[in-house]
Curated annotation (Swiss-Prot):
The protein, known as: Lipoprotein signal peptidase
Compartments reported by the entry: Cell membrane
NCBIfam families noted in UniProt: lspA (TIGR00077)
Active site, renumbered: 114, 130
Gene Ontology biological process terms from the UniProt entry: proteolysis
Family: Belongs to the peptidase A8 family.
Pathway: Protein modification; lipoprotein biosynthesis (signal peptide cleavage)
GO cellular component: plasma membrane
Membrane spanning residue stretches: 5-25, 61-81, 84-104, 125-145
EC number: 3.4.23.36
Length: 152
Protein backbone atom coordinates (compact mmCIF):
# COMPACT_ATOMS: atom_id res chain seq x y z
CA UNK A 1 0.00 0.00 0.00
CA UNK A 2 1.42 3.37 -0.92
CA UNK A 3 2.23 5.73 1.94
CA UNK A 4 -0.32 8.33 0.78
CA UNK A 5 -3.13 5.74 0.61
CA UNK A 6 -2.15 4.42 4.04
CA UNK A 7 -2.28 7.91 5.59
CA UNK A 8 -5.59 8.77 3.89
CA UNK A 9 -7.08 5.45 5.05
CA UNK A 10 -5.83 6.11 8.57
CA UNK A 11 -7.44 9.56 8.62
CA UNK A 12 -10.71 8.17 7.23
CA UNK A 13 -10.88 5.32 9.76
CA UNK A 14 -10.12 7.58 12.73
CA UNK A 15 -12.66 10.13 11.48
CA UNK A 16 -15.32 7.41 11.15
CA UNK A 17 -14.65 6.30 14.73
CA UNK A 18 -14.80 9.85 16.09
CA UNK A 19 -17.93 10.73 14.10
CA UNK A 20 -19.70 7.61 15.40
CA UNK A 21 -18.86 8.65 18.96
CA UNK A 22 -20.00 12.24 18.33
CA UNK A 23 -23.29 10.95 16.91
CA UNK A 24 -23.91 8.69 19.90
CA UNK A 25 -23.25 11.46 22.42
CA UNK A 26 -25.51 13.82 20.44
CA UNK A 27 -28.43 11.41 19.99
CA UNK A 28 -28.47 8.95 22.90
CA UNK A 29 -28.50 9.75 26.61
CA UNK A 30 -25.87 8.18 28.85
CA UNK A 31 -27.00 4.64 29.65
CA UNK A 32 -29.94 4.71 27.23
CA UNK A 33 -30.34 1.71 24.90
CA UNK A 34 -31.88 2.02 21.42
CA UNK A 35 -32.43 -1.03 19.21
CA UNK A 36 -30.63 -0.65 15.89
CA UNK A 37 -31.30 -4.09 14.40
CA UNK A 38 -33.80 -5.61 16.87
CA UNK A 39 -32.50 -8.75 18.53
CA UNK A 40 -29.06 -8.32 16.97
CA UNK A 41 -27.51 -4.91 17.68
CA UNK A 42 -28.48 -2.07 20.01
CA UNK A 43 -26.85 1.30 20.41
CA UNK A 44 -26.13 2.71 23.83
CA UNK A 45 -23.92 5.41 25.28
CA UNK A 46 -21.39 4.21 27.83
CA UNK A 47 -18.36 5.97 29.30
CA UNK A 48 -15.63 3.36 29.78
CA UNK A 49 -12.83 4.27 32.19
CA UNK A 50 -11.07 0.95 31.62
CA UNK A 51 -10.19 -1.40 28.81
CA UNK A 52 -12.20 -4.13 27.15
CA UNK A 53 -14.73 -5.67 29.55
CA UNK A 54 -14.10 -2.63 31.81
CA UNK A 55 -10.88 -4.09 33.23
CA UNK A 56 -8.25 -1.79 34.75
CA UNK A 57 -10.78 0.93 35.60
CA UNK A 58 -9.37 4.47 36.03
CA UNK A 59 -5.84 3.57 34.88
CA UNK A 60 -5.71 6.26 32.15
CA UNK A 61 -1.95 6.84 32.24
CA UNK A 62 -1.35 3.13 31.81
CA UNK A 63 -3.50 3.12 28.66
CA UNK A 64 -1.85 6.28 27.33
CA UNK A 65 1.64 4.78 27.73
CA UNK A 66 0.65 1.40 26.24
CA UNK A 67 -1.10 3.10 23.31
CA UNK A 68 1.90 5.31 22.53
CA UNK A 69 4.23 2.30 22.67
CA UNK A 70 2.04 0.09 20.45
CA UNK A 71 1.34 2.81 17.86
CA UNK A 72 4.98 3.89 17.90
CA UNK A 73 6.20 0.34 17.36
CA UNK A 74 3.66 -0.32 14.59
CA UNK A 75 4.74 2.84 12.74
CA UNK A 76 8.41 1.96 13.26
CA UNK A 77 7.77 -1.56 11.94
CA UNK A 78 6.01 -0.21 8.86
CA UNK A 79 8.84 2.24 8.20
CA UNK A 80 11.57 -0.38 8.55
CA UNK A 81 9.75 -3.08 6.57
CA UNK A 82 8.67 -1.35 3.35
CA UNK A 83 7.83 -4.58 1.52
CA UNK A 84 5.19 -5.99 3.86
CA UNK A 85 2.34 -7.82 2.18
CA UNK A 86 -0.99 -6.03 1.92
CA UNK A 87 -2.56 -8.10 4.71
CA UNK A 88 0.08 -7.12 7.28
CA UNK A 89 -0.21 -3.51 6.19
CA UNK A 90 -3.98 -3.67 6.59
CA UNK A 91 -3.62 -5.30 10.02
CA UNK A 92 -1.24 -2.57 11.19
CA UNK A 93 -3.48 0.14 9.67
CA UNK A 94 -6.43 -1.17 11.69
CA UNK A 95 -4.38 -1.47 14.89
CA UNK A 96 -2.98 2.06 14.53
CA UNK A 97 -6.41 3.52 13.63
CA UNK A 98 -8.12 1.83 16.55
CA UNK A 99 -5.39 2.87 18.94
CA UNK A 100 -5.57 6.50 17.81
CA UNK A 101 -9.38 6.55 17.97
CA UNK A 102 -9.46 5.45 21.60
CA UNK A 103 -6.35 7.52 22.42
CA UNK A 104 -8.18 10.69 21.32
CA UNK A 105 -11.03 9.85 23.71
CA UNK A 106 -8.68 9.17 26.61
CA UNK A 107 -6.79 12.44 26.14
CA UNK A 108 -9.88 14.54 25.48
CA UNK A 109 -12.36 12.98 27.92
CA UNK A 110 -10.39 10.69 30.29
CA UNK A 111 -12.66 7.81 29.20
CA UNK A 112 -13.58 5.99 26.00
CA UNK A 113 -17.04 6.25 24.47
CA UNK A 114 -18.55 2.81 23.81
CA UNK A 115 -21.82 2.28 21.97
CA UNK A 116 -22.26 -1.05 20.18
CA UNK A 117 -24.10 -3.79 22.06
CA UNK A 118 -24.59 -7.23 20.55
CA UNK A 119 -28.01 -8.36 21.77
CA UNK A 120 -27.64 -12.02 20.83
CA UNK A 121 -24.59 -12.71 23.00
CA UNK A 122 -23.41 -11.66 26.46
CA UNK A 123 -20.54 -9.45 25.34
CA UNK A 124 -19.04 -6.13 26.38
CA UNK A 125 -20.27 -2.90 24.81
CA UNK A 126 -17.62 -1.64 22.39
CA UNK A 127 -16.93 1.03 19.77
CA UNK A 128 -15.71 1.32 16.19
CA UNK A 129 -12.06 1.73 17.27
CA UNK A 130 -12.31 -1.48 19.32
CA UNK A 131 -13.56 -3.23 16.18
CA UNK A 132 -10.54 -1.98 14.23
CA UNK A 133 -8.19 -3.19 16.96
CA UNK A 134 -9.82 -6.61 17.21
CA UNK A 135 -9.90 -7.24 13.46
CA UNK A 136 -6.35 -5.87 13.09
CA UNK A 137 -4.91 -8.12 15.81
CA UNK A 138 -6.73 -11.19 14.46
CA UNK A 139 -5.53 -10.44 10.93
CA UNK A 140 -1.95 -9.92 12.14
CA UNK A 141 -2.04 -13.21 14.06
CA UNK A 142 -3.31 -15.02 10.96
CA UNK A 143 -0.50 -13.46 8.90
CA UNK A 144 2.12 -14.52 11.44
CA UNK A 145 0.62 -18.01 11.68
CA UNK A 146 0.66 -18.38 7.89
CA UNK A 147 4.29 -17.20 7.76
CA UNK A 148 5.21 -19.80 10.35
CA UNK A 149 3.39 -22.51 8.39
CA UNK A 150 5.17 -21.61 5.17
CA UNK A 151 8.54 -20.87 6.78
CA UNK A 152 8.63 -17.22 5.65
Amino acid sequence: MKKRLFVLSLILLVALDQLSKFWIVSHIALGEVKPFIPGIVSLTYLQNNGAAFSILQDQQWFFVVITVLVIGYAIYYLATHPHLNIWKQLALLLIISGGIGNFIDRLRLAYVIDMIHLDFVDFAIFNVADSYLTVGVILLLICLWKEEDYGN
